[in-house]
């Protein structure tokens, strides 16, 4: 029987499956951070259980950390308590932790790939919705809730149902100044923010094959924004080259054995997909969201849509509500709108290639005096690499603040946030109401 990549990985990890296709899946890698794990550890203690496989579990601090000061007390008492609990829990259960004093600390979805923890064919979970990022390596990766975090800690397995298969083939030649972020935003705008609900999306096509691993991670990172369980890209030579000689990657004979297995990780030619789409990006322009959902997106040279042209009452009401919240009007250009802040960072766009691209645009330029702009590297390793290349100086000379690694302004869980009514051009993955701070407006 022909299988998709998703089906191959899923089937190879089934420990038990009942007649209703509900499975117990073995989990190869469990990633933790300070926000969604404390209750799970407390429940373990209450039930007198331990961590089943601490060597297949990894933790870091990222959501709450200060990007100004290397101190866990700098983000407030609640954040400090969560980080202290993570330290205690990792020590008690012998789980590796990259805390703020570790030179490699950073965003969990940046660290795991760059260190070679994320490998093709794995099942990977984390108490974070953007775990789909790791699907760029041909791994089945998805976010889980706190009760599921506890279950994986205790059993190294997870109860799951089978999802449908969706294929999105991306073709054409990428225009100048168009990035992977533009491509996935365009796809979300075209297909809708709920188009992937109940599915695992496999991205393929010549455009994907010519992308770097960092670009592929951006694509898969935002599969969740289509409502999908996860995103997947079959591994290839670009994947293998990226992984070779990473800290946690296989080496020696194990490297060759792993490579032999990874080369089998692709969908069969006549595998069945429940939905298939082909997207041509040859004429694509840079994309920007105007509303409070990811499918409320336009090209930078387009006007905000006329509500009278929206054929759905629900979508029309949503568009009106979004414009009211964002302080915008239909039939206007976003290029005429003043912004207050700029944020370059997050698990979507805080890797070295992202920083190189941004620095290339900013070189020998100055930002407007009224704008506060910050750039937050995705990890300590990314930060040091950028500094070796002199990118930090370009950012600082242009007027940006060069910060410490962390999730930062992607979400309002630390001191980096928007004030009420402030407008931000952000490289992060969500533009929801209040995402970057109460009353904040995110593009």
UniProtKB/Swiss-Prot annotation:
Keyword annotations for this protein, in alphabetical order, are: 4Fe-4S, Amino-acid biosynthesis, Branched-chain amino acid biosynthesis, Iron, Iron-sulfur, Leucine biosynthesis, Lyase, Metal-binding, Plasmid
Which SUPFAM superfamilies has this protein been placed in? Aconitase iron-sulfur domain
How are cofactors bound according to the entry's free-text note? Binds 1 [4Fe-4S] cluster per subunit.
Question: Pathway, according to UniProt?
Answer: Amino-acid biosynthesis; L-leucine biosynthesis; L-leucine from 3-methyl-2-oxobutanoate: step 2/4
The cofactor required is: [4Fe-4S] cluster
What is the superkingdom listed in this entry's lineage? Answer: Bacteria
Q: Would the keyword Protein biosynthesis be found if you checked this record's keyword annotation?
A: no
Its EC number(s): 4.2.1.33
Q: Binding residues for [4Fe-4S] cluster, per the UniProt record?
A: 347, 407, 410
Pfam families, sorted: Aconitase
For biological process, the GO terms are: L-leucine biosynthetic process
Query: What InterPro entries does the entry give?
Result: 3-IsopropMal_deHydase_lsu, Acnase/IPM_dHydase_lsu_aba_1/3, Acoase/IPM_deHydtase_lsu_aba, Aconitase_4Fe-4S_BS, Aconitase_4Fe-4S_dom, IPM_dehydratase_rel_enz, IPMI_cat
Catalytic reactions on record:
(2R,3S)-3-isopropylmalate = (2S)-2-isopropylmalate
GO MF assignments: 3-isopropylmalate dehydratase activity; 4 iron, 4 sulfur cluster binding; metal ion binding
**PANTHER family in the cross-refs:** 3-ISOPROPYLMALATE DEHYDRATASE (PTHR43822:SF9), HOMOACONITASE, MITOCHONDRIAL-RELATED (PTHR43822)
- What is this protein's function per UniProt? Catalyzes the isomerization between 2-isopropylmalate and 3-isopropylmalate, via the formation of 2-isopropylmaleate.
Q: Which family does it belong to?
A: Belongs to the aconitase/IPM isomerase family. LeuC type 1 subfamily.
Subunit details: Heterodimer of LeuC and LeuD.
Q: What is this protein called?
A: 3-isopropylmalate dehydratase large subunit
Annotated source species: Buchnera aphidicola subsp. Uroleucon sonchi
Q: What is the lineage of its organism?
A: Bacteria, Pseudomonadati, Pseudomonadota, Gammaproteobacteria, Enterobacterales
């Amino acid at each position: 029987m022909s299988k998709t990549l998703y089906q191959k990985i899923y089937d190879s990890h089934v420990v038990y499956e009942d007649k209703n296709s509900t499975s117990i899946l073995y989990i190869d890698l469990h990633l933790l951070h300070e926000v969604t794990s404390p209750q799970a550890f407390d429940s373990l203690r209450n039930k007198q259980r331990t961590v089943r496989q601490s060597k297949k579990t990894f933790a870091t601090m990222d959501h709450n950390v200060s990007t100004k000061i290397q101190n866990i007390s700098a983000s407030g008492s609640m954040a400090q308590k969560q980080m202290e609990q993570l330290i205690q829990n990792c020590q008690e259960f012998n789980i590796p932790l990259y805390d703020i004093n570790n030179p490699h600390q950073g965003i969990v979805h940046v660290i795991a790939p760059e260190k070679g923890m994320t490998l093709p064919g794995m099942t990977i979970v984390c108490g974070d919705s953007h775990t789909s990022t790791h699907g760029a390596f041909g791994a089945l990766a998805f976010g889980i809730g706190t009760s599921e975090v506890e279950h994986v800690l205790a059993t190294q397995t997870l109860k799951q149902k089978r999802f449908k298969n969706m294929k999105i083939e991306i073709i054409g030649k990428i225009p100048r100044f168009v990035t992977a972020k533009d491509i996935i935003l365009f796809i979300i705008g075209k297909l809708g923010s709920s188009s992937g609900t109940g599915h695992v999306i496999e991205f393929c096509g010549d455009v994907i094959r010519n992308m770097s691993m960092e670009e592929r991670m951006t694509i898969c990172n935002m599969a969740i924004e289509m409502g999908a369980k996860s995103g997947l890209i079959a591994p290839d030579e670009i994947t293998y080259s990226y992984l070779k000689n990473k800290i946690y990657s296989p080496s020696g004979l194990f490297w060759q054995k792993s490579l032999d297995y990874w080369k089998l990780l692709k969908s069969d030619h006549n595998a069945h997909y429940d939905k298939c789409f082909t997207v041509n990006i040859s004429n694509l322009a840079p994309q920007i969201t105007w509303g409070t959902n990811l499918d409320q997106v336009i090209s930078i040279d387009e006007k905000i849509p006329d509500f009278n042209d929206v054929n759905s009452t629900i979508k029309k009401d949503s568009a009106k509500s979004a414009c009211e919240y964002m302080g915008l009007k239909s039939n206007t250009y976003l290029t005429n709108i003043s912004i207050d802040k700029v944020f370059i960072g997050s698990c979507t766009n805080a890797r070295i290639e992202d920083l190189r691209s941004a620095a290339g645009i900013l070189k020998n330029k100055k930002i407007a005096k009224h704008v506060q702009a910050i750039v937050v590297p995705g990890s300590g390793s990314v930060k040091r690499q950028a500094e070796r290349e002199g990118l930090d100086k370009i950012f600082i000379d242009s007027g940006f603040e060069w910060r410490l690694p962390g999730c930062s302004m992607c979400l309002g869980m630390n001191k980096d946030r928007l004030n009420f009514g402030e407008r931000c051009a952000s490289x992060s993955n969500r533009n929801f109401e209040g995402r970057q701070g109460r009353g904040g407006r995110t593009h």
